[in-house]
Amino acid sequence: MKVTLLGAGAWGMAMAAQATRHLQEGDVCLWSRSKEQLLDIQESGENRAYLSGIKLPEGLKLEGDFSAAVKRLSIDDLLVIATPMSGLSETIAQVLRVAEHPLNIIWLCKGLEPNTALLPHQVVERESKIHSHGITHSYGALSGPSFAREVGVGMPCALTVASKSPKLCEVVQAAFHHGNMRVYSSDDLIGVELGGAIKNVLAIAAGIGDGLDLGLNARAAVLTRGLAEMMRLVKAAGGKSETCMGLTGVGDLILTATGDLSRNRRVGLELAAGKSLPEILASLGHVAEGVLCAQAVGDLAKRLGIEMPITAMMDEVLSGKLKPHDAVKKLMGRDPKIES
């Protein structure tokens, strides 16, 4: 089989490496819009901008022609969109314009579209109505507790592919389920995508708590009550609340809220230290999806009539309406309730 990955950031590189370890030379293709980046990767054997120090497996094909990267795939192959959430709409529209037959398409981004609060699959469905030219593609999301750097070097990892198409799930497993990576399947696209979005916001909250030295008790409270918020929203949005107890919910939440490689956790730590959000984002150099989707998650919760106090406080902190220590006071000052 052949695999094409669109986007040569950290995740595109990591998953390209994972597929290349298993498939034949030339079967895996990585596309980037930047000719300079492709040249640097070709000359150095690594992605120094995103995954410095990690040598890519031999046999990976680099491509700068978008149309060629897509058209090399047959109906049994796999297209992976490895852009951030902010680039999903543009990328899928471009794919649909050049695709000549049905494709198996997955995305790696986690979050909601700003301004619309749409989930990734809803963005894809919207663009499909405009650009698909009558061709029906299979879609899905690949998500779970994983840092790109660890995947890039082949450390053990477990992910979940979510799709209404059993065939697509099988194609994704054929591409990535080998060596130190396990890929489970699910039909709960809503639950998987919302879990991946909300956990990023909660990881910022956990980082703030750790940065303010609130203790391990506080961290446990944030994660547990945050998980309850996640489950409520998933159920209200039409997903399965039990999905939140799996890899893409509590699994990804634990990793992102406690792991030192987490950009979202780092945002929380530095907010607690008194740094401004623009200053923090400039120092990161990469996307922290929780910053971009906190307001969108809050908007979706309001639309569905779901109370999410931790998420709401993070939106106020990130928008500059509330200081981190004041957010803690507001949360701790809430009226007592039955645990649910």
From Swiss-Prot:
Family matches, as Pfam families: NAD_Gly3P_dh_C, NAD_Gly3P_dh_N
A cellular component term, taken from the record's GO annotations: cytosol
GO biological process: carbohydrate metabolic process; glycerol-3-phosphate biosynthetic process; glycerol-3-phosphate catabolic process; glycerophospholipid metabolic process; phospholipid biosynthetic process
Residues given in the record as sn-glycerol 3-phosphate binding sites: K110, G144, S146, K199, D252, S262, R263, N264
Keywords: Cytoplasm, Lipid biosynthesis, Lipid metabolism, NAD, NADP, Nucleotide-binding, Oxidoreductase, Phospholipid biosynthesis, Phospholipid metabolism
Active site: K199 (proton acceptor)
SUPFAM superfamilies reported for this sequence: 6-phosphogluconate dehydrogenase C-terminal domain-like (SSF48179), NAD(P)-binding Rossmann-fold domains (SSF51735)
Molecular functions (GO terms): glycerol-3-phosphate dehydrogenase [NAD(P)+] activity; NAD binding
PROSITE patterns: NAD_G3PDH (PS00957)
Binding site residues for NADPH: W11, R33, K110, A148, R263, V287, E289
Domain of life: Bacteria
Predominant subcellular localization, coarse grouping: cytoplasm
Catalytic activities: sn-glycerol 3-phosphate + NAD(+) = dihydroxyacetone phosphate + NADH + H(+); sn-glycerol 3-phosphate + NADP(+) = dihydroxyacetone phosphate + NADPH + H(+)
Location in or out of the cell: Cytoplasm
PANTHER family cross-referenced by the UniProt entry: GLYCEROL-3-PHOSPHATE DEHYDROGENASE, GLYCEROL-3-PHOSPHATE DEHYDROGENASE [NAD(+)] 2, CHLOROPLASTIC
Function: Catalyzes the reduction of the glycolytic intermediate dihydroxyacetone phosphate (DHAP) to sn-glycerol 3-phosphate (G3P), the key precursor for phospholipid synthesis.
Similarity comment text for this entry: Belongs to the NAD-dependent glycerol-3-phosphate dehydrogenase family.
Protein name listed in UniProt: Glycerol-3-phosphate dehydrogenase [NAD(P)+]
Origin species: Polynucleobacter necessarius subsp. necessarius (strain STIR1)
